[in-house]
Amino acid sequence: CLSKYDDALDAEGVDDNPGKQRLEKAIAGKYTAEIFGRIVGREACLALPDAWAFDPEAGSRTHAGHVTQLRRYHGVMADVATALIDRCADLTAAALAGVIKSQDLSTPHTVGILAEGTLFWQTEGYRERVEGTLNRLTPSHVQVRILQNASDVDANFIGAACAALL
């Protein structure tokens, strides 16, 4: 499901390990605005009214928030923004479903996934889409819940601690 836009982003991102971490580049908020700009064109992003305009090539000064707000715009820009955010959610769900299915859970289970990031917690409908898609992709006896890290502890440390307990 990766596109020529993903390929270009990967090839031109010399500091971002070309050829590696392809899924992360397709789903992470860090890259969303740049992919959007590659789809609609930099000029189209810059030509938007001031409240909506952004430079998709501005590196760390641009982010998924620029794209998520465009879902409320109109026309093709809103359609592309919606499709891109939905694709991020669906690819995230597919990757997580693969991990869950690899566990070969044969009895009823509730699986909790600790998620962090602005797409999950600041993008309307994103978490729900990931959760819904995950539940469709996993066996019916497995219920998946996306959990928010409400502590000040980095989610990676929490995950490492949980893995160490297994």
Language model regions located:
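Small-residue (GG/TT-enriched) beta-loop-alpha framework at ligand/catalytic clefts
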Residues: 1
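ATP-binding/phosphotransfer module of carbohydrate and carboxylate kinases, centering on a glycine-rich
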Residues: 4-166
